[in-house]
Curated annotation (Swiss-Prot):
This is Cytochrome b. It is found in: Mitochondrion inner membrane. Heme 1 (or BL or b562) is low-potential and absorbs at about 562 nm, and heme 2 (or BH or b566) is high-potential and absorbs at about 566 nm. It is a multi-pass membrane protein. PANTHER family: CYTOCHROME B. Signal peptide: none annotated.
Amino acid sequence: MTNIRKTHPLMKIVNSSFIDLPAPSNISSWWNFGSLLGICLILQILTGLFLAMHYTSDTMTAFSSVTHICRDVNYGWLIRYLHANGASMFFICLFMHVGRGLYYGSYLFMETWNIGVLLLFAVMATAFMGYVLPWGQMSFWGATVITNLLSAIPYIGTELVEWIWGGFSVDKATLTRFFAFHFIMPFIIAALAGVHLLFLHETGSNNPSGLSSDTDKIPFHPYYTIKDILGMLVLILMLSLLVLFSPDLLGDPDNYTPANPLNTPPHIKPEWYFLFAYAILRSIPNKLGGVLALVFSILILALIPFLHTSKQRSMMFRPMSQCLFWLLVADLLTLTWIGGQPVEHPFITIGQLASILYFLLILVLMPLTSLMENSMLKW
């Protein structure tokens, strides 16, 4: 008799995705981040659901409702900090996942990659809206500054911003709609992740060598299920250490002050995972130019498959490209640091140089280096 997991309509889908899925035998721990992102998403949906039971999306009570969750709700502090720091872990996994894709040439699976870029935008939008909800000083001013960027769009900018605000400033209408969108977006992200997986399973996974692994496949279960569980344990350990020992390490102290439209904080900055893009935005003196650079800094990922000039897929056997990749990583870390600094000398100059280098590396230096490596191989 055939096993039920191979015949039952629902079990069949699970079986072909997580049990009998043929996987390359040599994929490293860099391939763990997909499953870790799934765990992060589930954690965020669950903790978010419990937070939403106690949160009120009204400007008068939002801040005190978050305080109430932390002080009066059973383990409310734990749920709140798991949610806030879970977002940080989510972005760490996201950046690692994208970095893996860049290094090993996974972006040549075009459909999977483009849905991944769409997912990145969706997660960033969700995180931004979530940061507004506690209605602290940085929530309010972050929302004001970031939504105001849309006013740089010619002709329709001002009307668009007021339409998003639901008035003439960030107020009750803005908070209510941000809460509604923040609640629905994770489910849209989950659906997109399903499509992401669907396209991935059409082609099968890439592997560190970048070569075809059709001749050497192993079943996903038990090999990679066990491997993924190890990754999950490490993730849970790191998140637990963060939540239980220093839950406010990655937050902003200004957000413990209730929102006050009459008092601007000295340094308005987003959460750490947006600082690299914020630094690129600030490095351009022109408002529209800054907004375009900000959008393009993420959208540039969609161009990467077209900028692939190497005869090899992976960077595993390309030492010169590897150097440029790690230079890009260092550049992004520099941008992250600059984004959190005040706008003054020498940070302005460093930010401008790092921003130029970011676009130069991706658009010019990496494709040219790949061509040079091709000629060195006499191809």
